[in-house]
Amino acid sequence: MENEKMQVNFAPGMTEATLRVIELHEENELPVLEPDKVELAGTIGSVHEFLLKRISEKEQINQKRCYILVDREKMTLKLVTNETDSRNKATVRGELKYYPKFLEFGINTSKTWEPVQLSKFFKMNCAFFKDAQYNMELVTVLKNFKASIDSKVENSRQDNGSRTDNYSQVVNSNLPASFNLIVPIFKGRPAEEIEVEIIADVDGRNIRLSLCSPGAEVIVEEERNKAIDEQLLLIRKLAPDIAIIEQ
């Protein structure tokens, strides 16, 4: 430590002070940290968007060291960069997600409704019905749901051991056979017009309703593959040397 002159000012009434000097012999270096892991997730277009903005960064996007996994059942695309470099590897996952309101309807699921409960839900979501007037009529029908049940029981036994044991139940109600919705099935995709059937399950006084749409199931299969194929086409044009693997 070089000799340096210092000036010390005393408070009134003080005549002396003790000065302590601490000399550091080691440099105070910052610790060396591992790079942060890049693990991103978003909509089905996320992989293409990431590549579009980073394709010029050769250290990050070496196409021969990247690959994309395609899972059509889970409706996902997963990009992995720097595949052999655990310190600098990055993953970007894009997923085709269902439109939240479509899920709320519970179409083609095990979800069931009480008639009054379903009428309230339809009333609050009239914007998704093709015909607003028909929506109000359907709401009224559900609020005043009526059903009659015709049951037949046949039970007999013959001397030769033959036995008959049959039970049949026919439910007649004021519910319409079907109605039409206009709603997106997947996020970021256009709205689809689908025909929806109301299925009634009557057990004594317990009445549960469910919504079924074969047409929606067809659209799910078609749109899932269409959306994924559209993204793969864009990716192949942008980065043709990235390996694309179907799972």
Residue ranges and their predicted role:
Residues F10, G106-T112, V153, Q158-L175:
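Intrinsically disordered, low-complexity segments that are common in secreted/host-exposed effector
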Residues S110-N160:
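Membrane-inserting effector segments that mediate pore formation, membrane fusion
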